[in-house]
Amino acid sequence: ALQVLSFDLPGHGGRKDEPAPCRIQVCVPELKAVMGYAKKRWAHVGLFACSLGACFSLAAYADEPLEQALFLSPVLDMRRLIENMMGWFGVTQERLCRERAIETPTGETLYWDYYCYVKEHPVRRWDTPTSILCGVRDELCEPDVTARFARQYGCRLLTRPEAGHYFHTPKELEALRQWLTASL
């Protein structure tokens, strides 16, 4: 029997109205605290993470002996995502360095210190047996990034041609259910 322990990132789910920023420097210590809690209670710990949660989990849990990881629409290269966002909104590195924080038209904020952090701390290790489900039409996480990560770290990769970043249609949710059932 599985026991599920859920954690929302700042600004998401049950923490939607929290003022804490959803940044790797904030979330990694929180994720490490959650892992400490889980390891005190259960001998076998696995991970399910989606989007930014996967990115932050890669940073927090690289040295953890996890049974397995399941990633849904994972952000696997935060540097590339930030640089893509900078390009979409015409923000140069020089401007971001000078202004330190720039709010985008989508409501997301680009931060210089965050950008520097992800440049200095790319994923260097991931030994956990991992399965990834993502959409071919993912507008945030480019398929080549996901495929390269899967090859580099020996992950099982399943792509859905009809899906984008957010799995939400009945067909996408059914694909998610089938993937979870097959993976567990």
Where do the protein language model's features map onto the residues?
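Nucleotide-sugar donor-binding loop of glycosyltransferases
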Residues: 8, 51, 136
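Catalytic nucleophile-loop/oxyanion-hole region of alpha/beta-hydrolase
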Residues: 12-41
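Soluble or luminal CAZymes and related metallo-dependent hydrolases
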Residues: 26-30, 110, 172
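The alpha/beta-hydrolase serine catalytic core
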Residues: 44, 65-148, 152-159, 164-167, ...
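Gly/Ala-rich beta-loop-alpha elbow adjacent to hydrolase catalytic centers
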Residues: 49-57
